[in-house]
């Protein structure tokens, strides 16, 4: 019989870094062209007017303007960016 206890190492202690996904700019907020609006996996939010979609599904603004979250159909959401004049007419 052995006189020493076998000491094993724990198999825990690993975790992946968070990906910092989510909405970065909110409804009514002013953004500059190229600003990241939403970081996502898949298309939870669709690109709307003046919004582009990157290779990793990130949504970004194509123009300087104001962010507007809208419904697209029954169960999809879209993010658009409007100029100040457009935003005032859409908001009312």
UniProtKB/Swiss-Prot annotation:
The organism's place on the tree of life at top rank: Bacteria
Keyword tags: Ribonucleoprotein, Ribosomal protein
Pfam families recorded: Ribosomal_L27 (PF01016)
Biased composition (Basic and acidic residues): 12-21
InterPro entries linked: Ribosomal_bL27, Ribosomal_bL27_CS
GO annotations of cellular component type: cytosolic large ribosomal subunit
GO terms, biological process: translation
Stretch forming the signal peptide: none
Ranges where the record places region Disordered: 1-21
GO molecular function: structural constituent of ribosome
Similarity comment text for this entry: Belongs to the bacterial ribosomal protein bL27 family.
Protein's UniProt name: Large ribosomal subunit protein bL27
Taxonomic lineage from the root: Bacteria, Bacillati, Bacillota, Clostridia, Halanaerobiales
């Amino acid at each position: 019989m052995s006189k020493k206890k076998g000491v094993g190492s724990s198999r825990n202690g690993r975790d992946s870094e968070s990906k910092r996904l989510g909405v970065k700019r909110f409804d009514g907020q002013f953004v500059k062209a190229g600003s990241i609006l939403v970081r996502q996996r898949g298309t939870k939010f669709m690109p709307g007017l003046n919004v582009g979609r990157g290779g990793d599904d990130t949504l970004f603004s194509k123009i300087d303007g104001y962010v507007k979250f809208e419904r697209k159909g029954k169960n999809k959401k879209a993010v658009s960016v409007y100029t100040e004049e457009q935003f005032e007419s859409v908001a009312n």
